[in-house]
Every structure is written in C-alpha cells, then in structure tokens.
C-alpha cells in the first residue's frame, strides 16, 4: 500500500535526500513524497534537488527561502549573496515550481497539515499572516509569534490540534515532538541530519514521543553552511 513520506528542510542536499529515500525503501510511483519547504539556498545542489522532486512527483509547501526568492523574482526585494547565487541560475520551469508551492498542504487521510514553520493556535490557517506560516518559531502568552528562538515558548507547545501539524524551519539537533505538532528540521545543511516521517496509508500521526518509531534519519555528508555547529549549537 502507498505510504506518505514527509521530509524536513533539504536545502539542496540532494545526496542526503536520495540516501534517506533509499533507507526508507521509497517506492517510486507508489509512495508519496511531501517536503516541508526550503528545498533551496545554503546547500550544494539547486538544480538537482528540483529535478529529483519533479521526477518523484513530490509535493512541497513553500518555505521562507522560496518566498524570498519569489519576492526578488517579482521585483519586490533585493537579495543577499546566498539567495542571489540561486536566483540567477533558476530556469523558467524552476521558477514555476516555486510559484506553485502552497503555504500549507492538508493530508486528510492522516488528519495532518504540512506547513513550513508553524501555525498560530486558535487562528484559522487561512486567516494567519503568511509570515507566521513561513517564519515563526515561538509564541508568547498573548499569542504574538516570533522568529526569535528566545522570544517565548515553542509554538508547538501551545498548539492543541487537530489537525496534527508537520513542519520544519527551526533547525535543531533532534526533531520537535509535541502532542499535536512534529518538527522535522534537523539541520542537514549545517552538518546535522535529514529526517523523514514515514506514514502507512491512512495512518494517523501518533502524538508526542509515540511518533518516534516512524522517524528515520540520515547524517549529512558534511556541513555545507554556517560556522561550527551552525544553529544546532544553540
């Protein structure tokens, strides 16, 4: 039966994604691949990761790095050097891939929702600001969200579902395992790991630590970006 494989922030680490899919026994043409965004920037392989995603029929939500690239593409904002190196080599077809990425993706068969960074508890997702979905890490007792790691509790600690939210964005040494939210960004591009959540057909996501047996990871081939440990040293 078809499975759903949800993978954390890839950042151009094509080799690690291929290794991870081999490890989980991904069945091309049968299993479904879902990506939490930030396919590009900081890592080594811009064209390769997009070609692999296209070949496998992957679905990806939009990450903050795709959003930044698209803002430049529509002549709204300038870019720094990391993004400029990517933006200047993307083809028309690759830009269309980025344009097609939604801010969130619902997986009703798993009672799950995939978003890049997070959701605001108590706020309907179609009423939430795009910035929150793309960048939030924490949220305070007033419901004010922030991209700063020390601005309040992790948003997942305050979210009470349903649906279960699967997200990325905040690179940490280990996955975030909250009751109703699972964070998969384990910092592959910084020399950490690339992590997948593997679900059987129609399988709901277990809550909290119970999800751990469904998580599979591979170690980065090397650090591609940042200083010693990058954000994983926090």
State where each predicted segment sits.
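Acidic, His/Gly-rich catalytic cores of divalent-metal-dependent hydrolytic chemistry
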Residues: 125, 130-234
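Beta-strand-turn-beta hairpins that frame and shape the catalytic cleft
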Residues: 1-5, 106-113, 178
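Active-site environment of divalent metal-dependent phosphoester hydrolases
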Residues: 11-15, 41-43, 67-70, 121-122, ...
